[in-house]
Amino acid sequence: MAETNLYIVRHGKTMFNTLARVQGWCDTPLTQSGRDGIHYVGLGLQDTKFEEAYSSDSGRAIETMRILLSEHPDGKDIPYHVDPRIREWCFGSLEGGFDAEMWGVLPRVLNFKTEDELFATEVTFEEIANA
């Protein structure tokens, strides 16, 4: 069986990342710093042979992938697929709120005493989205 390598790159820094806001399905654009960082990642992957590329359907993921592919010598020939099934978590009513508020609310609404207890326990995506 042939060896397969999977490379996972997180999207570049966004406006909400800068503002410490919860961002799952809500979408904010990459900052200049985020775009610059992804260009550097792309430069670092120039010698890597890719068969295909995938991203979620969020604008920040699509922009990230376009930047990565623009830095690759074969980028125009690498098949690129946008797939909503790999979209980030939806944080429900917490979307767009402050990160600190989310981390204060999640343990309580999921019936944990502390944030540490929450992280020590498996919580499903559905439980978080419905919190």
Question: Predicted regions span which residues?
Answer:
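Phosphate-handling substructures
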Residues: 72-131
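Active-site-proximal alpha-helix that buttresses catalytic centers in soluble enzyme cores
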Residues: 4, 9-75
